[in-house]
Amino acid sequence: MIKPHGGKLVNRIVEGAKREELIKKAGEMPRIMLNRDELTAVDNIATGLFSPLEGFLTSEDYNRVVEEMRLADGTVWSIPEVLGVTREEADNLKEGQDVGLYFEEDDELYAILHLEEKYTCDPEREAELVYGTTEEEHPGVKNVYKRDEILLGGKISLINRLKYDDFNNYRLTPAETREKIKEKGWQTVVGFQTRNPIHRAHEYLQKCALETVDGLFLSPLVGRTKASDIPADIRIKSYEVVLDKFYPRDRTMMVVFPAAMHYAGPREAIFHALCRKNYGCTHFIVGRDHAGVGDYYGTYDAQKIFDEFDPEEIGITPLKFEYSFYCKKCGGMASGKTCPHSADDHIFLSGTRVRKLLREGKKPPKEMTRPEVAEVLIQGMQQ
């Protein structure tokens, strides 16, 4: 089986006597309140989804990730995973200290941060290098600008897993997915990341990929997305419909990806691929404008970025697909690589156009969206 990124699967979950000891000591520690995105990141670090990270980046790691897409030791990592606090909060913390991490929604202790460093950064520099723009209209840049100014670096120890009340059948840790992949006997597995409901173009890409590997690992993102994106519960239902009716169940598995969208385009494509590698995938589908937003990135920038690295240091093989469509003359799904006909013969709808139709209670063309899926989406969008 493919090794996790960095060579081993990180596990920062503490149990038994060590856990009880940390809980007792936590009462004397300074406290920091985390929002849902921050606590989700803590959980993902602890379970190994973000391997090789063991905590939030120190300044040396942060600067190298921002500038070179590498950690301080040279390991490829493309998105800075950081924890920001106010200057007032930071003044009450000392480097070398343990800090209790609490969830703002229930005031419960979830983890301990072993604080190594307090530091500042230049948000505009981060925005320009990570997102390719300093415009606040970009949702990822907006989050960087509103983040508290002092960053805390250090390893974490997880006391309690983050509790979810949705999609629990599809919430598996990398250790659990790797065990399932072993049980299925899959030697090669292709991962597919999406924040959209399933449509025929994605189905076409997935099935093309499945022709060449043992298993398909569908991984819908269920963390924070833009308000205009279709809600996660509706998206998951759309996948359940097609998995039940149109996919070989013994060659597919669906595991939700519990992380927020950064909309970092090419850099996020690398990040998404590395996380699927940690789940046990050997291949990863990269389509048009992966993790993009608006017109900030070129159509295939997210594919080209993989060429900047030695394939061995990425470790997971990108499968690069052009955008696909229904061709009336071909009589089926195709792409620019396989179809000789003009755009006049192609049926393709943007996500914006599809969402508009669904909100109006209208079904998109059956060539682009299966009627069974359209019904689920219309019902969900009109609730």
UniProtKB/Swiss-Prot annotation:
**Pathway(s) annotated for this protein in UniProt:** Sulfur metabolism; hydrogen sulfide biosynthesis; sulfite from sulfate: step 1/3
Name the InterPro entries on file: ATP-Sase_PUA-like_dom, PUA-like_sf, Rossmann-like_a/b/a_fold, SO4_adenylyltransferase_pro, Sulfurylase_cat_dom, Sulphate_adenylyltransferase
**Under the GO molecular function aspect, what terms does this record hold?**
ATP binding; sulfate adenylyltransferase (ATP) activity
Q: Which reaction does it catalyse?
A: sulfate + ATP + H(+) = adenosine 5'-phosphosulfate + diphosphate
UniProt organism field: Halothermothrix orenii (strain H 168 / OCM 544 / DSM 9562)
- HAMAP family assigned: Sulf_adenylyltr
In Gene Ontology terms, what is a biological process of this protein?
hydrogen sulfide biosynthetic process
Fetch the SUPFAM superfamilies from UniProt: Nucleotidylyl transferase, PUA domain-like
* Record protein name field: Sulfate adenylyltransferase
**Family under the similarity heading:** Belongs to the sulfate adenylyltransferase family.
* Enzyme class, UniProt record, top EC level: transferase
